[in-house]
Amino acid sequence: MRVRGIERNCQNLWKWGIMLLGILMTCSNADNLWVTVYYGVPVWKEATTTLFCASDAKSYKTEAHNIWATHACVPTDPNPQEIELENVTENFNMWRNNMVEQMHEDIISLWDQSLKPCVKLTPLCVTLNCIDEVMENVTMKNNNVTEEIRMKNCSFNITTVVRDKTKQVHALFYRLDIVPIDNDNSTNSTNYRLINCNTSAITQACPKVSFEPIPIHYCAPAGFAILKCRDKRFNGTGPCTNVSTVQCTHGIRPVVSTQLLLNGSLAEEEIIIRSENLTNNAKIIIVQLNESVAINCTRPYRNIRQRTSIGLGQALYTTKTRSIIGQAYCNISKNEWNKTLQQVAIKLGNLLNKTTIIFKPSSGGDPEITTHSFNCGGEFFYCNTSGLFNSTWDISKSEWANSTESDDKPITLQCRIKQIINMWQGVGKAMYAPPIEGQINCSSNITGLLLTRDGGTNNSSNETFRPGGGDMRDNWRSELYKYKVVKIEPLGVAPTRAKRRVVEREKRAIGLGAMFLGFLGAAGSTMGARSLTLTVQARQLLSGIVQQQNNLLRAIEAQQHLLQLTVWGIKQLQARILAVERYLKDQQLLGIWGCSGKLICTTTVPWNSSWSNRSLNDIWQNMTWMEWEREIDNYTGLIYRLIEESQTQQEKNEQELLELDKWASLWNWFNITQWLWYIKIFIMIVGGLIGLRIVFAVLSLVNRVRQGYSPLSFQTLLPAPRGPDRPEGIEEEGGERGRDRSIRLVNGFSALIWDDLRNLCLFSYHRLRDLILIAARIVELLGRRGWEALKYLWNLLQYWSRELKNSASSLLDTIAIAVAEGTDRVIEIVRRACRAVLHIPTRIRQGLERLLL
């Protein structure tokens, strides 16, 4: 009885142990997290890439020799997309923006390429015999300012087509373009040379070259995007909370100018002051106006151009004669300018905590810096801006300290024209601009200022600002301050409870990918948000790339008649190759990971809590993909490597599994092509067994010899059991009971093979029989134990059901009894109260009777 009790207790412990183990396994599996690959997530990283251009050059001018060469650009999108990114904050830095450097290099390349086929003026570096051109002093219109227009009538010898012969020609040069030889500045000097002959290589601009700036849109190739800050008061650096994504920038006019920014974009609300460090006087200050100020420039006199041959196939274009009407000038409305400058002064005073803002002219330097230099109708103007920057603003009194006139009389800027221009691209380069025939008029809008602050340790309340410029990067920076280029990373990894269970052997579809622009609209959504539709996003990448490549090819085909591509053509080729490379790289990674054609791909790589110990709910409900990518960025390479190793191992397992497919059909087992393979395997097995038998026989003989047994030969008989009628041993020695009689060890090679095969078959039969009996016993025990466990669980369920039912009934009975008792007590209390009230008159009467008695 005691044994049976112990057996029953052990059975109960066994059952409870199995149940506990199952619960633990379930709980442990529920907490396991696995790496899952997502394709099409809205994640980006800062990057530097080759941008290409888009422009509507043909709609502006059909001039084939425009210096900006925008005819090689892709046509602009008639319906550009701008997708707002909600709940996204991105850092911008206009002073560390590669787009500015790239635009600067592009514009330099365009200038150099446009001037490359033009005439070099090295043969013109000769002695010029010049005299003053007979001119009169002229009065500038609307300003009553008289100034002498200085030009020199020069004669010089040039080489004709026949190189050993020269001829003398005459031409008019501006006084600013020539200098006396040997620095003789006397008024009586007659020997001159071109100003840049001893320092720069001078190239004459081609006569048909146009300098009219045409808006250029910079576009990102497929796989990249341009982020745009839409904060109306963004100062160019720091975080921006209102971010959108665009494929191309707005149209940027590459206007080369100093001091004043022309034909740019305006601020939407108030004037914006931008500087890398406002307290550092060495840093340029870029002012973006909120209202433009018109500037109208005129060259009233009419030049007559002449063509002079200076060699075989080369010609010099100079001024032959001109009609004198007046000096070149520019007009600006005084009221508009003073109003604008007043707002700028208030803004600067508030930023620097100064009460008085002083504007003064440039302190000196090259003409390009001390004046407002720009191109007007093909001529290069150098205008004196001392009339614009010569005022003082008292912020405390909100008035001009040197009260200016309030009339609307325009401010007239005196302008000089130069034909030999120092190239802004670098030192040692100069350009000769041929004179333009006829009268020149141009109108522009002042949209910004370039200022510098005077230095010193003055702690007073005054601050002085002067016009600056000269570095064209600041001109491009004033337009590109709100853009940055990012590289889209459509591949993302995150932990989930899903694990790749089986190896699929069907064909996989070709993947598409994630749209390089459209899907970024979901960047502010959480990782588990329903708005993140990966399927829609993934279908757009390849079609977007194809469309973009078609546009690039059309632009490149338009240039095939040229002997060499412009800088835009080269960039289009680079963008085309880069887009395909980006797509193929992502597809290669997906293929290596076994995720081709899948937007959500589970893996067998367990998630390591050291990568991120956040809970699954916290990751998918509270974090965006950008935040998640920043958190695991240091471990992305490790995760990718583990996924690759896991997929490699899975492919090996798959290969081994596929190798067993030829045994899937029973008929294949009897295929005649397999017979030779069967025979080979059979021979190998038999040979191995025979060899093993021989080895063990030799080892047995060696062992017997060591024990003192010396067989005469391989025919030595082994002891065999005696019969019951034979005596055990001889008389002298007696016999050992149980000794076997001798049998032959071997009897030829055939007998050896037969014995081995027979023993092998018997051994296999006995072992298989034992194995089958053991397996049957195990199955029987497992079935019995399983059935008992099921019956126990069923009885346990019935027991707890009865207990719950009884408990519920008892609870209801108890509640009913308590309610009944409470109700009876309440009724009794109410009844006694009513009875007491009813007996009040009786008690009063009884009291009165006692008093009367």
Swiss-Prot record:
Q: Where is this region: V4?
A: 383-415
The name of this protein is: Envelope glycoprotein gp160
Ranges for the region named Fusion peptide are: 509-529
Spell out the InterPro entries in the cross-references.
Gp120_core_sf, Gp160, GP41-like, HIV1_Gp120
The record's section on Pfam families has:
GP120 (PF00516), GP41 (PF00517)
Q: What else is known?
A: Inhibitors targeting HIV-1 viral envelope proteins are used as antiretroviral drugs. Attachment of virions to the cell surface via non-specific interactions and CD4 binding can be blocked by inhibitors that include cyanovirin-N, cyclotriazadisulfonamide analogs, PRO 2000, TNX 355 and PRO 542. In addition, BMS 806 can block CD4-induced conformational changes. Env interactions with the coreceptor molecules can be targeted by CCR5 antagonists including SCH-D, maraviroc (UK 427857) and aplaviroc (GW 873140), and the CXCR4 antagonist AMD 070. HIV-1 lineages are divided in three main groups, M (for Major), O (for Outlier), and N (for New, or Non-M, Non-O). The vast majority of strains found worldwide belong to the group M. Group O seems to be endemic to and largely confined to Cameroon and neighboring countries in West Central Africa, where these viruses represent a small minority of HIV-1 strains. The group N is represented by a limited number of isolates from Cameroonian persons. The group M is further subdivided in 9 clades or subtypes (A to D, F to H, J and K).
Query: Which GO cellular component does the record give, naming just one?
Result: host cell endosome membrane
Q: Where is the signal peptide?
A: 1-31
Q: Which gene encodes it?
A: env
Region of interest (MPER), residue spans: 659-680
Coiled-coil region(s): 630-664
Annotated segments matching region CD4-binding loop:
362-372
Q: Which UniProt keywords apply?
A: AIDS, Apoptosis, Clathrin-mediated endocytosis of virus by host, Cleavage on pair of basic residues, Coiled coil, Disulfide bond, Fusion of virus membrane with host endosomal membrane, Fusion of virus membrane with host membrane, Glycoprotein, Host cell membrane, Host endosome, Host membrane, Host-virus interaction, Lipoprotein, Membrane, Palmitate, Signal, Transmembrane, Transmembrane helix, Viral attachment to host cell, Viral envelope protein, Viral immunoevasion, Viral penetration into host cytoplasm, Virion, Virus endocytosis by host, Virus entry into host cell
Q: Which residues lie on this side of the membrane: Cytoplasmic?
A: 703-853
Q: Which family does it belong to?
A: Belongs to the HIV-1 env protein family.
Q: Which GO terms describe its biological process?
A: clathrin-dependent endocytosis of virus by host cell; fusion of virus membrane with host endosome membrane; fusion of virus membrane with host plasma membrane; positive regulation of plasma membrane raft polarization; positive regulation of receptor clustering; viral protein processing; virion attachment to host cell
Q: Which organism is it from?
A: Human immunodeficiency virus type 1 group M subtype D (isolate Z2/CDC-Z34)
**Gene3D superfamilies for the chain:** 1.10.287.210, Human immunodeficiency virus 1, Gp160, envelope glycoprotein, Single helix bin
Residue segments, region Immunosuppression: 571-589
Instruction: Write out the ranges of the annotated region (V5).
Output: 457-468, 460-468
